[in-house]
Amino acid sequence: KEYSYYFQECYPIAISRQRFIDEQVAYKNPSLGYLCLAELISKNKIKNIWTTNFDSLVETATNIIDPQKDMLVCSSANSTSIPNFNPQHPCICKLHGDFRYDTLQNTDEELQALEKAIYEYWKQSMMGRGLVVVGYSGNDNSIMNFIEDNIDDPAFLSKGLYWTVIRDGNVSQRVENLILKAREKGKIAEIVETDGFDDLLYD
């Protein structure tokens, strides 16, 4: 809530918000965690990544580790092409937009709902699979509503939901309620303490 509020206050015009994000994330180098993640992608250990970040660090890291690896990038800019995606290729889906192409979602109003095509693609991709949540607090409705709306489906996240949090940190009541509801539906659901993104992926 604070994030979206101050974003709106400082940059009330959408194009100004997009330019600010562009300045912050363009030409950044991936950290150790991203390089480790890229190695897992290269070895086909991780198939899909769903991110609220606007940057291209995952793509950059993957290109460093495995320049020959084909990776699909999904955002609102190309969501009409989702039916043509080759499921054999790993995919990174920018849930709030890609700073290079999209109208970004970062104010409270913009964070209320996912684009329909992306919503359906994510939903189908989570059938018979699990989800590890890293570096996300659960403070925007679009993502939380998506998980909450589908958690009753036995096939959705049937391999479990693992919500990571910095050691000795806290999760919101909404996240705790989601974990409890997932367990009630017979799913494996855990809050996992970590020492941060880089340490988690390196370990």
PLM feature segments, named:
Residues 107-122:
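Active-site glycine-rich loop that binds ribose-phosphate moieties when present
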Residues 55-57, 98-100, 137-139, 168-169:
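Short, solvent-exposed loop/turn segments at secondary-structure junctions
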Residues 1-52, 57-58, 64-67:
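Gly/serine-rich nucleotide phosphate-binding loop at the start of the catalytic core
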Residues 27-31, 111-115, 140:
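A conditional alpha-helix N-cap/helix-loop micro-motif detector
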Residues 51, 96, 165-167:
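Short beta-strand/turn micro-motifs composed of small residues
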Residues 42-47, 64-71, 80-88, 119-203:
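SIR2/sirtuin-family catalytic core signature
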Residues 2-27, 72-75, 87-111:
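A charged nuclease-like catalytic/ligand-binding cleft shared by nucleic-acid processing domains
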Residues 30-34, 73-78:
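Short acidic (Asp/Glu) patches
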